[in-house]
């Protein structure tokens, strides 16, 4: 297990990190759109198969550390190897996760009526793929981009039947609330790429996939209640 410093979990999700605005100077404080040349520069700095690690919250893997003011803390984070890529097809730039381990979501499902689902998910060795549209947002002072992920889908056998289970991320709301849940950046210090996703919850055998009605992840870690889950992909 490797300690990841730039990773946090909160009960009520806000932005995975604070986005820096490139303002036009007017009173409306709007962000200046990137030019096509700037978007191409962003693409060149992020494309390829760079992020090969996944970090996620897990109380099965605890690291103790001491803060700068000499206070002992515990960090509930584990890491796994994954395969990701960012490529453009002439229309959209897309981030693809090729072997996502859905079993990690079992930790975020609790309740007596969810035991069969939880156990089936814990035993699931299937790795699934999912895609996210990349929208480049700023080039300077920090290269940042929004991510619009599709639902993560897996078929699970439990209770004598096959069930389709879909996992949903929170939706970004750039305007007017400026709540950014799924996004990425290039670290200015290391020039390494990282991306964050905030998961809301799941739906079993959805009746209307165009209008999902997911159940929120609700669980406790170190006796503290949490809603939702955050995962991070990063370049080692």
Segments and roles (model prediction):
Residues 3-8, 15-44, 230-236:
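Bacterial Sec-dependent N-terminal signal peptides
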Residues 27-34, 167-236:
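Edge beta-strand at a domain terminus
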Residues 34-46, 71-96, 102-103:
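A beta-rich soluble binding module of mature secreted/lumenal proteins
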Residues 82-179:
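Predominantly extracellular/secreted and cell-surface proteins with exposed
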Residues 75, 123-125, 162-164, 211-220:
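Short, mixed charged/polar active-site loops
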């Amino acid at each position: 297990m490797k300690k990841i410093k730039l990773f946090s979990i909160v009960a009520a999700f806000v932005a995975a990190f604070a986005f820096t605005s490139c303002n036009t100077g007017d009173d409306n404080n709007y962000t200046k759109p990137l030019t096509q040349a700037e978007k191409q520069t962003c693409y060149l700095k992020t494309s390829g198969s760079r992020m090969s690690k996944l970090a996620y919250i897990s109380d099965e893997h605890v690291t103790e550390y001491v803060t700068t003011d000499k206070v002992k803390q515990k960090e509930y984070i584990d890491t796994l190897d994954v395969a990701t890529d960012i490529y453009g097809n002439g229309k959209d730039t897309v981030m693809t996760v090729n072997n996502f381990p859905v079993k990690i979501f079992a930790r975020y499902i609790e309740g007596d009526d969810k035991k069969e689902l939880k156990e089936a998910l814990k035993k699931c060795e299937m790795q699934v793929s999912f895609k996210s549209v990349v929208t480049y947002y700023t080039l300077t002072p920090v290269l940042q981009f929004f991510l619009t992920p599709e639902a993560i889908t897996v078929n699970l056998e439990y209770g004598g039947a096959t069930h389709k289970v879909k996992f949903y991320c929170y939706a970004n709301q750039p305007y007017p609330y400026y709540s950014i849940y799924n996004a990425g950046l290039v670290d200015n210090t290391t020039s390494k790429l990282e991306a964050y996703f905030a998961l809301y919850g799941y739906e079993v055998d959805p009746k209307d996939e165009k209008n999902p009605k997911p159940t929120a992840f609700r669980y406790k870690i170190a006796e503290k209640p949490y809603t939702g889950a955050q995962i991070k992909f990063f370049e080692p």
